[in-house]
């Protein structure tokens, strides 16, 4: 005989859930806007965006608090789809109980012979991909963790074939050599093939971040109109959800002629007539984050990129036995150049997961390193902080991070406190303290500028000091004043960097 709760008991339980949920939402809203403490009112139909002003990171924090309070596991897409606390309530009521992950079988690729792994004479990214296709076309280049699906393996040959179809589609739609094509796509196979396909068509890719939430597509596009106009983008490659609304951009971006999806590009059947790229040709436009002003487009040539990729590889001593595990967005230089294009050049596999997967489940990054025996990974400081503050011990049982030899920490200020907390906590799971590698870079240098010596423990010093790190061998630098004279010592410093990249 089973005991079913009465209707009144069920109603009481739901009301308690509502009360706790609204309390969590209001508490976070107050923390974000303490000056409006008394005026913040939260109902089941309050808009998370308009009324409570929750951005993507605020939503991530809210998910952590809800899961902890109710002991449930919310779906990853929840971050993008929830619009009100009522949506949160439905998700909590439908969510399964949270379960600890189990250790997954390891995935390994056979190492390549040293003479087969690196295209030393390649002069462009086209040369790099074609070289690998000639040497080991079926070797797995990318392990892609797509939402709701099993891991997808993409070989060098598969990437080139897919990219060539995209290139034909772009040519048929009028993309001219040297013209820019903006990519507003989420992490996935489409992004990789459309990026390479644009280059094969003779165009210049312009990576842009996709809208985080569907209800905000129009606002997102409006904010990007200035970048699209500045880039003289004649083509926008995006998702079917964005495509209809993106047509509104044509009045704000005079050069915009084509708005197309990856599926439409792949429908072309003609043979690709290849174009010859030169080292000095533009490979893509990398827009800065805009943290110090309006985002600026940085022109990166094939020569720039290959110089920086080779310099970074030399500093950290990579080879084809390495594995790069990344959740970093592909519109950011650390994710695009450091993770993907670096792995493309050096023939070590890239394990790619979406930023949303990491933000909702930070432990998924660590488990991917465990499963694939990852040796290299990277994150801004906040990613390491999330692993320290938002991952419970129960979610780490059986985790082994002993393979992780290079943990880049950059793209934002590095916190000594975070470095200490992360290394101390995860040394219990095999992470080596000397694997933490604080780095400095900027889009104008393609990516990397300074790196500490490999194998050295992080040095945390609070005295006023000028030497910050060693540059790569191909990146000489000096410290100067505003008047460009050599300076030593000083309080206010400028870095004058001269680089091929």
Residue ranges and their predicted role:
Residues 1-111, 161, 234:
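Phosphopantetheine-dependent thiolation modules in NRPS/PKS and related acyl-activating systems
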Residues 114-123, 260-282:
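Flexible, low-complexity linker/hinge segments
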Residues 128-154, 283-285, 292, 441:
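AMP-dependent adenylate-forming
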Residues 221, 229, 241-260, 355-501:
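Conserved adenylate-forming
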Residues 306-323, 333-375, 389-394, 453-454:
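Conserved AMP-binding/adenylation subdomain of ANL enzymes
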């Amino acid at each position: 005989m089973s005991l079913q709760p009465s209707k009144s008991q069920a109603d009481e339980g739901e009301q308690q859930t509502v009360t706790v949920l609204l309390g969590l939402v209001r508490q976070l809203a107050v923390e974000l806007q303490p000056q409006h403490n008394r005026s913040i009112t939260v109902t089941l139909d309050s808009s998370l965006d308009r009324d409570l002003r929750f951005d993507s990171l605020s939503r991530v924090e809210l998910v952590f608090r809800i899961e902890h309070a109710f002991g449930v596991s919310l779906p990853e897409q929840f971050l993008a789809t929830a619009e009100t606390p009522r949506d949160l309530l439905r998700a909590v009521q439908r969510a399964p109980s949270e379960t600890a992950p189990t250790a997954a079988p390891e995935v390994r690729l056979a190492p390549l012979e040293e003479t087969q792994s690196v295209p030393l004479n390649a002069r462009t990214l086209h040369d790099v991909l074609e070289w690998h296709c000639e040497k080991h076309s079926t070797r797995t280049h990318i392990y892609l963790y797509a939402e709701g699906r099993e891991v997808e393996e993409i070989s060098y040959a598969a990437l080139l074939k897919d990219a060539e179809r995209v290139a034909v589609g772009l040519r048929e739609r009028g993309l001219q050599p040297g013209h820019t094509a903006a990519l507003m796509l989420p992490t996935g196979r489409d992004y990789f093939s459309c990026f390479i396909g644009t280059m094969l068509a003779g165009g210049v890719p312009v990576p842009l971040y996709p809208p985080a939430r569907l209800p905000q597509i129009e606002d997102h596009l409006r904010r990007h109109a200035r970048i699209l106009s500045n880039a003289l983008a004649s083509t926008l490659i995006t998702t079917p959800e964005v495509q209809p609304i993106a047509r509104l951009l044509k009045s704000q971006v005079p050069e915009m002629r084509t708005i197309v999806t990856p599926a439409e590009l792949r429908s072309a059947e003609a043979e690709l007539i290849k174009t010859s790229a030169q080292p000095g040709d533009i490979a893509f436009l990398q827009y800065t984050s805009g943290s110090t002003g309006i985002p600026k487009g940085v022109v990166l040539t094939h020569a720039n990129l290959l110089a920086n990729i080779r310099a970074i590889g030399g500093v950290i001593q990579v080879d084809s036995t390495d594995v790069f595990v990344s959740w970093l967005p592909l519109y950011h230089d650390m994710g695009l150049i450091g993770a993907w294009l670096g792995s493309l050049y050096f023939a070590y596999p890239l394990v790619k997961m979406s930023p949303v997967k990491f933000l909702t489940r930070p432990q998924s990054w660590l488990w991917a390193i465990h499963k694939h025996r990852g040796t290299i990974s990277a994150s801004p400081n906040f990613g390491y902080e999330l692993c320290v503050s938002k991952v419970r011990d129960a979610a780490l049982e059986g985790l082994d991070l002993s393979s992780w030899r290079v943990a880049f920490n950059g793209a934002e200020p590095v916190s000594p406190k975070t470095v200490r907390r992360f290394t101390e906590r995860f040394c219990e799971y095999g992470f080596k303290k000397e694997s933490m590698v604080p780095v400095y870079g900027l889009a104008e240098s393609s990516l990397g500028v300074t790196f500490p010596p490999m194998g050295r423990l992080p040095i945390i010093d609070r005295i006023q000091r000028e030497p910050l790190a060693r540059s790569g061998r191909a990146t000489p630098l000096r410290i100067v004043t505003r008047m460009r004279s050599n300076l030593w010592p000083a309080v206010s410093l400028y870095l004058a960097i001269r680089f091929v990249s």
